[in-house]
Swiss-Prot record:
GO terms for molecular function: ketol-acid reductoisomerase activity; magnesium ion binding; NADP binding. PROSITE patterns: KARI_C, KARI_N. Signal peptide: none annotated. Its EC number is 1.1.1.86. The gene is ilvC. The active site is at residue 107. Belongs to the ketol-acid reductoisomerase family. This is Ketol-acid reductoisomerase (NADP(+)). Residues 1-181 form the KARI N-terminal Rossmann domain. It comes from the Bacteria. Keywords: Amino-acid biosynthesis, Branched-chain amino acid biosynthesis, Magnesium, Metal-binding, NADP, Oxidoreductase.
Length: 337
């Protein structure tokens, strides 16, 4: 797998172009501000009436309605929520994209699953930072960067890849390393990670542990500390030094319990069998079709689950305990503009 760094990228491929960033949420604000600070001619495209409009202007960015921003641009980076991209593309992006322009994404979902079918005259590429927007911005400001994936879906001009690499350099990603991949691999592995491990898997493991302790008569506060609060301590060790490094840092008692009892909590082969089914549903497009239909009918399953999970006792206990820890800073995610 090829990794590219700053010396591999020529900013000239992006400095000579007008870039429109659609959206000013977590990734949008970071991309737009980093591009601006790198000397790129950037404007932000937002819906009229968007709550993000004033924020973007206050940050010193030029803000336009989506269609107008697209008409001006040579490169259009789409940083809207997955479920909104296809409609915005059909109604406001495609009719205004100049011939021979470039269409860019930070996630391959809509292109890979055919929700967006770009014209043949366009370059289509992706730069996907492997970190949240606030980190993409803060690391750039420190003179560092967040690693990113880069991929080309369509190369009409013959220079799609160097342009994508230049874009990655302009947002700071090439300082840390840019890994070449494909839209297929980025999309399918990203969805799998979210569903099986990072979001779906981890939340079920946490909830099961919390409920087991509470149902056995332990105080909910103790259960929360042991099954929720301390997750960060272990994840940080894994993040910094891998599984081996984490095990080096914990007690021998904890390490022995890890090896001898972990399979009771998460049976490895059975878990892999279930994970293969999750992956099959992603690869076949079944999940994508389900998610698109869910949005077409008003997101009833999503909303019902939000309410159900928000009502779980773990939320009330956690809220009380976090209020006792002033060193914690709650981060409220803003709606993508």
């Amino acid at each position: 797998m090829k990794i590219y760094y700053e010396h591999d990228a020529d900013l000239g491929f992006i400095l000579g172009k007008k870039v429109a960033v659609l959206g000013f949420g977590s990734q949008g604000h970071a991309h737009a501000l980093n591009l601006k600070d790198s000397g790129v001619d950037v404007r932000v495209g937002l819906r009229k009436g968007s709550r993000s409009w004033e924020k973007a202007e206050a940050a010193g960015l030029r803000v336009l309605p989506v269609a107008e921003a697209v008409r001006e641009a040579d490169v259009v980076m789409v940083l809207l929520p997955d479920e909104k991209q296809a409609q915005v593309y059909r109604e406001e992006v495609e009719p205004n994209l100049k011939e021979g322009g470039a269409l860019a994404f930070a996630h391959g979902f809509n292109v890979h699953f055919g929700q967006i079918k770009p014209r043949k005259d366009l370059d289509v590429w992706m730069v996907a930072p492997k970190g949240p927007g606030h980190l993409v911005r803060s690391e750039y400001q420190k003179g560092s960067g967040v690693p990113a994936l880069v991929a080309v879906h369509q190369d009409a001009s013959g220079s799609a890849f160097p342009t994508a690499l230049a874009y990655a350099k302009a947002i700071g990603a090439a300082r840390a390393g840019v890994i070449a991949t494909t839209f297929k691999d980025e999309t399918e592995t990203d969805l799998f990670g979210e569903q099986a491990v990072l979001c779906g898997g981890l939340t079920r493991l946490i909830r099961a542990g919390f409920e087991t302790l509470v149902e056995a008569g332990y105080p909910p506060e103790m259960a929360y500390f042991e099954t929720v609060h301390e997750v960060k301590l272990i994840v940080d060790l894994i993040y910094e030094a891998g599984l081996k490094g984490m095990r080096y840092s914990i007690s021998n008692t904890a390490e022995y319990g890890d090896y001898t009892r972990g399979d009771l909590a998460v049976p490895l082969e059975e878990t892999k069998r279930r994970m293969r089914e999750i992956l099959r549903q992603i690869q076949s497009g079944e999940f994508a079709r389900e998610w698109m239909l869910e949005n077409q009918v008003g997101s009833p399953v999503l909303e019902a689950n939000r309410k159900r999970w928000a009502a779980h006792p773990i939320e009330e206990v956690g809220s009380r305990l976090r209020a006792m820890m002033p060193f914690l800073k709650a981060r409220v995610m803003e709606e993508v503009g």
